[in-house]
Amino acid sequence: ELWHYSYPVSVKRNHGMSRTVPAVTDKFVVTIGPKLHVLCADALTGKPYWMIDLVKDYGATVPPWYAGQCPIIDGDRAIIAPGGSTLMIAVDCATGRVLWRTPNPKRWAMTHSSIVPVSMGSLKTYVYCASGGVVGVSATDGRMLWELPDWKVQIANIPTPVPVGQGRLFLSGGYNAGSMMVDVTSQGGAFSAREVYRLKPETFGSHQQTPMFYRGRIFGVIPDGRLVCMGLDGKHIWDSGTARFGLGPYVVADGKLYVLSDQGVLTIVDPNASKYTPLGQARILGGSDAWAPLAVAGGRMIARDLTKMVCIDLTGK
């Protein structure tokens, strides 16, 4: 252990407590705590720079099962979606000064989904699924560019929007939400968003994990536990048949699709094949709530369940 930092917060264990992934640069670490305390610390020493209480400062509502939103750092700014009085904020990482705020007149609440940067032509934007719909915000000044209230997920909206190119975004969720393809266009500086198609949950509906987009294909685990490979037209290319994976994470790295099951079994799949093609399999965890996102870097994978974290060598050396 190089350093640690903690602050007191009263919480009850409910499938664990830590659901958000810190944003890290060579200078800063930004975290969102279970009850919406945003902390920025020095990446080398752990020295805290600043903290923002989203509940106190913005009237944010703590989501069920506590915070699930992952902060992002874009350049020298932390981008956060509080909900309450303010839909989104940009914070200077060095000082904690709020650089811009996006008003939230409809009082859409924070969800477990996270913000994703999306370029719309030459304009950089941030897209976020709030409780009342999906929105696009200017990265320059926080101005609301478009909103689509047609997309709502009851109880818990968890997956992040997936940019698939040409102004389109793929949205997916659990609790019978299914999926939606959205097309965002602009004319004369005015943006608009429309539904291209909607899929029933049994066709494609990801409960917890954000679907993967790779080489024109969308990958995800649907409610019955099958891994599905789907084209941008919303039609299945293949599925995993009798193989089931549950609520665990998946990631594409080095041309392979890694899928972790609820039981802690890691399966390697060929994402380019015309049918479900597993390449290898190994149990790496005990499996209790093995739902946290997988992280891959330098030929290694970090995975965890409720009680254990492991680092796996993917190079075969």
What residue ranges belong to the model's regions?
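Blade-level signature of beta-propeller repeat domains, shared across WD40, Kelch, NHL, RCC1
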Residues: 177-179, 264-265, 287-317
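Short coil/turn segments that connect the beta-strands within blades of beta-propeller domains
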Residues: 26-27, 75-76, 122-124, 166-167, ...
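Extracytoplasmic beta-rich repeat domains
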Residues: 4-23, 51-73, 83-85, 101-123, ...
